[in-house]
């Protein structure tokens, strides 16, 4: 029977298809891959954990019954995510290895394995908001260390910075499979540094990051205020740059606006090309949704894609999340995808966004916390009871909105952008130095966001 599994599965699919809507069949069933037959258990591969959970909860019985009709036998169904199975086996092997030898930070299995296979240049949707960043990324991928070094990408959350970084890594590896490409978040870099210090393996750590061809570091802003991490990254940067190796960095803001970042790092980040990514316009948002639906092999009416794109303007992650939510809702209710269904599926999402997060709201919440008048934020008063809450409000405006420094300055009585930058840097330092201040500002931020 093992040899006949493809034919058996084909017949099973033909029995299942009439029982479901086209959307449900395409979304959940079509992506299933027959892996093997182990006794009376059919092993079926699925693309991700979310799909696995849905299939287990809603469709396992349907599939089992269809298999019984096809083969006249009872089968247990087990869904697996093949990529996760491989990872768990690798981790198990690594644990066994670590049990018999000293743990080493260095590895020939470079972090290129961490590159998301979906994040390539082919799947990146180009629009006016990201055209220059895309062109710069492609130039770097085509000629590592010759075009722009470093390449510094910045922009808000979920706008495509990580996608472009992964795409660069994939492109380089495709053209040179032997290239040593490391993709790492700044948090991971910090954690690995801490572990290397704890276990006295600094040499291995440095070898890992300084003997490579391409280093991609995501969310570099999180090393701000971490002296040891900045020190190590400074020397790593120098070693790679002097060896003519490519460095790509991403952040949520340009180098000059990252608080408590050492000047020597700031200047090095500015050696190459700095390019930003802005929120996508309506046409680009529709194109992104169309591309996502195409990749997932889902048929979604154009009017629904337009409806989503008009409602969600913030970032790509939320756009794609809304599309997945609508498809899941359609499948779970066994209904066709329409604008009405989309509105119903997303009503909770939209209602939670009803309270507009803007500077007026930030001023209102901060003013209530510090017993001050709203107009005091725009006044010239410099007493600490006024100036410090004003700095907190400026800090939160920078952290919680996408407004530029000059625009924030305008909202606070026409102040210069350097005043906003100073306020942000001061509060950032206070947060690092004083846990009470950190907790208080976190509480204010949660209240502003409605958490």
From Swiss-Prot:
One Gene Ontology term from the biological process aspect of the record: regulation of DNA replication
Domain II: region residues: 73-113
Region (Domain III, AAA+ region) location: 114-330
Superkingdom, natural source: Bacteria
Role description: Plays an essential role in the initiation and regulation of chromosomal replication. ATP-DnaA binds to the origin of replication (oriC) to initiate formation of the DNA replication initiation complex once per cell cycle. Binds the DnaA box (a 9 base pair repeat at the origin) and separates the double-stranded (ds)DNA. Forms a right-handed helical filament on oriC DNA; dsDNA binds to the exterior of the filament while single-stranded (ss)DNA is stabiized in the filament's interior.
Stored Gene3D superfamilies: 1.10.1750.10, 1.10.8.60, 3.30.300.180, P-loop containing nucleotide triphosphate hydrolases
Ranges for region Domain I, interacts with DnaA modulators: 1-73
UniProt-recorded name of the protein: Chromosomal replication initiator protein DnaA
GO molecular function, one term: lipid binding
Main location: cytoplasm
Domain IV, binds dsDNA: region residues: 331-451
Keywords carried by this UniProt record: ATP-binding, Cytoplasm, DNA replication, DNA-binding, Lipid-binding, Nucleotide-binding
Membrane-spanning parts: none
Protein location: Cytoplasm
Binding partners and assembly: Oligomerizes as a right-handed, spiral filament on DNA at oriC.
Signal sequence interval, chain numbering: none
CDD domains xrefs: AAA, Bac_DnaA_C
């Amino acid at each position: 029977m093992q040899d006949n599994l493809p034919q058996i599965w084909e017949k099973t699919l033909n029995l299942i298809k009439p029982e479901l809507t086209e959307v449900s069949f395409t979304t959940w069933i079509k992506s299933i891959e027959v892996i093997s037959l182990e006794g009376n258990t059919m092993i079926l591969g699925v693309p991700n954990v979310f799909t696995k959970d849905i299939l287990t909860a809603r469709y396992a019985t349907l599939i089992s019954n269809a298999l019984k009709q096809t083969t006249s036998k009872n089968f247990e169904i087990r869904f697996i995510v093949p990529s996760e199975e491989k990872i768990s086996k690798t981790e198990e092997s690594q644990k066994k290895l670590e049990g018999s030898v000293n743990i080493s930070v260095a590895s020939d299995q470079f972090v290129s394995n961490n590159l998301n296979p979906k994040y390539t240049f082919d799947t990146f949707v180009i629009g006016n908001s990201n055209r220059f960043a895309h062109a710069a990324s492609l130039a770097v991928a085509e000629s590592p260390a010759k075009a722009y070094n470093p390449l510094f990408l910045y922009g808000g959350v979920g706008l495509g910075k990580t996608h472009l970084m992964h795409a660069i890594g994939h492109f380089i590896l495709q053209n040179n499979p032997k290239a040593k490409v490391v993709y790492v978040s700044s948090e991971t870099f910090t954690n690995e540094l801490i572990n290397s210090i704890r276990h006295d393996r600094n040499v291995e750590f440095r070898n890992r990051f300084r003997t490579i061809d391409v280093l991609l570091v995501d969310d570099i802003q999180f090393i701000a205020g971490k002296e040891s991490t900045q020190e190590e990254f400074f020397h790593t940067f120098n070693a790679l740059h002097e060896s003519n190796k490519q460095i790509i960095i991403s952040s949520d803001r340009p180098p000059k606006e990252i608080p408590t970042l050492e000047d020597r790092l700031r200047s090095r980040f500015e050696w190459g090309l700095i390019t930003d990514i802005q929120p996508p316009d309506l046409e680009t948002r529709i194109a992104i949704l169309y591309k996502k639906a195409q990749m997932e092999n889902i048929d979604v009416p154009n009017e629904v894609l337009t409806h989503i794109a008009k409602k969600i303007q913030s970032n790509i992650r939320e756009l794609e999340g809304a599309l997945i939510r609508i498809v899941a809702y359609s499948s779970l209710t066994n209904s066709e995808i329409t604008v009405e269904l989309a509105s119903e599926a997303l009503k909770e999402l939209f209602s939670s966004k009803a309270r507009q997060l803007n500077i007026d709201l930030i001023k209102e919440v901060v003013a209530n916390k510090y017993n001050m008048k709203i107009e005091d934020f725009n006044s010239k008063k410099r007493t600490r009871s006024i100036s410090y809450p004003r700095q907190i409000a400026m800090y939160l405006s920078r952290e919680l909105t996408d407004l530029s420094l000059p625009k924030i300055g305008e909202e606070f009585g026409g102040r210069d952008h350097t005043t906003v930058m100073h306020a942000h840097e001061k509060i950032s330092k206070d947060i690092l130095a004083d846990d009470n201040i950190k907790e208080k500002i976190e509480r204010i931020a949660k209240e502003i966001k409605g958490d």
